[in-house]
């Protein structure tokens, strides 16, 4: 079976769509599989959404009740006046409670990783494990001042005449090549909504100005659950220096680390099947 045929089969496994209210805003999430199975929660990165996982989640439905959240300001969730890691932690908890999930394995990409790690310190009982996908949760002290997270590259104020024009404009942030155009097209299809005057990104452009984060060094050092790391060996974000520092501070054993050859920051768009294999191995050992 070709990768495209695999993708076509995967997205035939359709999720159900749900909403839960958190701090007066409707938070959207998707669910695949039987709800009485152990929970597996996917958390997207900045300016992404739950449908990024449409072709990943079905691989786990035999063993898990799989959930993917749209954090506020993203996807089909409502926008807020301001954002913080604590607000997102409340949203994660609310989705777990709405699905009656007592303890979940969490898989989080990019900014979703720092959000999830912080949530482990607030609601430790909800986390069975946390797998970080090319996610910077702490920085070496000499890198903090000069670090750029690319949030300024998001232009949520652009208006397009139609969905096709909007989809053609879609780019991965941070920029990187990707040979799997059908995956990008699927993600782009779910990244825009029709508004006044045309089609716009679903992502809230003001998040970059209001999002509040914090240093997570102490949280990583005392994480209440196993931490796994899956990263792109060609990642332009998650460098070897950051990996080594994260392993040192978190005292994370080497057997919980998997690098995916030939992939960059958006590793599960570059090579989804290898990422699925890595995730199965790591969460299966928890």
Regions found by a protein language model. Give the residues of each.
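Conserved loop-alpha-helix segment in the C-terminal half of the alpha/beta-hydrolase fold
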Residues: 222-263
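Flexible "cap/lid" loop of the alpha/beta hydrolase fold
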Residues: 118-121, 128-161
